[in-house]
């Protein structure tokens, strides 16, 4: 079982950088995650374990409510190394100041651990525990 991720993109749309990053994530996380087709931020999301932002843009400031409305873990994985790019800290910091939690791994090992945690989370939602 793999983690199911839905990539989202901002109102300014997808560009070549977004598409390159998405393909890099698919390659890096091929064993850990199934990455769906991208969805515009604010559009209905398919069933998934988390959303992933492969690219952070200034649009985040104007689309704050659409980000807040996401009822799944929000991953910020914006570098080709499977981590958060250093210049995205400002947007992430702003989101945090507005009460919006994000997960931004700082190395590929941590990213892969997050994928496994998402897999376990889904498994446990369907599990039944017997308590004596």
Protein language model annotation of sequence segments:
Residues 1-132:
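An N-terminal assembly and electron-transfer interface module characteristic of large anaerobic redox
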């Amino acid at each position: 079982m793999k983690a199911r991720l839905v990539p989202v993109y901002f109102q300014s749309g997808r560009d070549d950088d977004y598409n390159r990053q998405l393909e890099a994530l698919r390659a890096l996380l091929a064993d850990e995650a199934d990455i769906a087709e991208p969805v515009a931020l604010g559009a209905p999301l398919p069933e998934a374990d988390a959303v992933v932002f492969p690219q952070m843009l200034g649009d985040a400031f104007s689309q704050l409510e659409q980000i807040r409305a996401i009822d799944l873990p929000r991953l910020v994985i914006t570098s080709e190394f499977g981590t958060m790019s250093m210049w995205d800290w400002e947007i992430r910091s702003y989101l945090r100041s507005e009460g919006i939690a994000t997960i931004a791994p700082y190395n590929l090992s941590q990213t892969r651990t997050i994928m496994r945690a998402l897999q376990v989370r889904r498994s446990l939602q369907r599990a039944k525990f017997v308590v004596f």
